[in-house]
Amino acid sequence: MPLSLFRRLLLAALLLVIIWTLFGPSGIGEELLSLSLASLSPAPASPGPPLALPRLLIPNEKACGGPGSPPFLLILVCTAPENLNQRNAIRASWGGLREAQGFRVQILFLLGEPSLWHPTKEPHDIDLVREAAAQGDILQAAFRDSYRNLTLKTLSGLNWADKHCSMARYILKTDDDVFVNVPELVSELIRRGGHWEQWEKGKEPPRAVKAGDKEWEERPILKSQPMPLLYLGRVHWRVHPSRTPGSKHQISEEQWPPTWGPFPPYASGTGYVLSASAVQLILKVASRAPPLPLEDVFVGVSARRGGLTPTHCVKLAGATHYPLDRCCYGKFLLTSHKLDPWKMQEAWKLVGGSDGERTAPFCSWLQEVLGILRCRVIAWLHS
């Protein structure tokens, strides 16, 4: 084959890959398309009656309190009582951060009760109380912890955030097998919020510190302005309910009649961000939504009833698992799914460790140019 023809074919193949990346499934084109959803949304439904949620066994009401500014980002991690190794891996890695880009970050683990028939239920209960006392990051509600109760778990967490952490600017809901690049996520939220808010480095001391006191440090000052609505994640489009008997994703025709068609667009439950105002809106209309056991679908349905549409973000991995790669995890990805405790800590080492410092760039110049495309190719080859 002549060299010139080979180069043309290579260039054509590269262009096709770039076009697929931009406008294929979960590409930047899809992110732009999601911006048009707001104009297609129905009028918001009127608020429904208050939600009937299970009582909190470990309420942890003061988790967002304490000295200093309120959390900029509250992270709610859905976990199971027996998943202690996953929780400890998160605490020892990205969940150990209490500040990112100068703003406070708070993490809480959401869980229910061990199954009544579980042979180790009572020891689990005792261990959870001890863990909660030692760590201060547990939020437990009185329901049987199972996949089909994820909606109860998530709503309990969002309701807690609205009541006891209402000053948090954003809430991330995620799972205990998901790696979160907290510094990059905070930077992403600052960039997206920059259209409506002003973020400044200032020398304004906290109220408890007298003017002229040199003991306080320069910190970003968040001006008090109205929060815009934000529902950000890996958006799923035109998903039809599964009718497969016995499937954990099964939705009956009574729960979602065939005449309703596909689900409205919703963000993958592996990781989505809601502004505080979006949380309030969803809680107001959630009691009018059909009681679906799939929490990410339920949140999407509730958001739509409130007139809120999800915004697609290509950096949120959804259900995709990305193999460990310093450039992808440190620069381009905000989340990655299906990481066991060992991989969780290895990923944290790749992106800088507990101090967040690094001596070399995350990516070479070529990796920077290829960007998220390279990460997707790696994930595809790995799968």
Swiss-Prot record:
<dbReference type="GO" id="GO:0000139">
    <property type="term" value="C:Golgi membrane"/>
</dbReference>
<protein>
    <recommendedName>
        <fullName>Beta-1,3-galactosyltransferase 4</fullName>
        <ecNumber>2.4.1.62</ecNumber>
    </recommendedName>
</protein>
<keyword id="KW-0812">Transmembrane</keyword>
<keyword id="KW-0808">Transferase</keyword>
<dbReference type="GO" id="GO:0001574">
    <property type="term" value="P:ganglioside biosynthetic process"/>
</dbReference>
<dbReference type="GO" id="GO:0047915">
    <property type="term" value="F:ganglioside galactosyltransferase activity"/>
</dbReference>
<dbReference type="GO" id="GO:0008499">
    <property type="term" value="F:N-acetyl-beta-D-glucosaminide beta-(1,3)-galactosyltransferase activity"/>
</dbReference>
<dbReference type="GO" id="GO:0006493">
    <property type="term" value="P:protein O-linked glycosylation"/>
</dbReference>
<keyword id="KW-0328">Glycosyltransferase</keyword>
<comment type="similarity">
    <text>Belongs to the glycosyltransferase 31 family.</text>
</comment>
<feature type="glycosylation site" description="N-linked (GlcNAc...) asparagine">
    <location>
        <position position="149"/>
    </location>
</feature>
<keyword id="KW-0333">Golgi apparatus</keyword>
<feature type="topological domain" description="Cytoplasmic">
    <location>
        <begin position="1"/>
        <end position="8"/>
    </location>
</feature>
<feature type="transmembrane region" description="Helical">
    <location>
        <begin position="9"/>
        <end position="29"/>
    </location>
</feature>
<feature type="topological domain" description="Lumenal">
    <location>
        <begin position="30"/>
        <end position="383"/>
    </location>
</feature>
<dbReference type="GO" id="GO:0016757">
    <property type="term" value="F:glycosyltransferase activity"/>
</dbReference>
<dbReference type="InterPro" id="IPR002659">
    <property type="entry name" value="Glyco_trans_31"/>
</dbReference>
<keyword id="KW-0735">Signal-anchor</keyword>
<keyword id="KW-0443">Lipid metabolism</keyword>
<keyword id="KW-1133">Transmembrane helix</keyword>
<dbReference type="Pfam" id="PF01762">
    <property type="entry name" value="Galactosyl_T"/>
</dbReference>
<comment type="function">
    <text>Involved in GM1/GD1B/GA1 ganglioside biosynthesis.</text>
</comment>
<comment type="pathway">
    <text>Protein modification; protein glycosylation.</text>
</comment>
<keyword id="KW-0472">Membrane</keyword>
<keyword id="KW-0325">Glycoprotein</keyword>
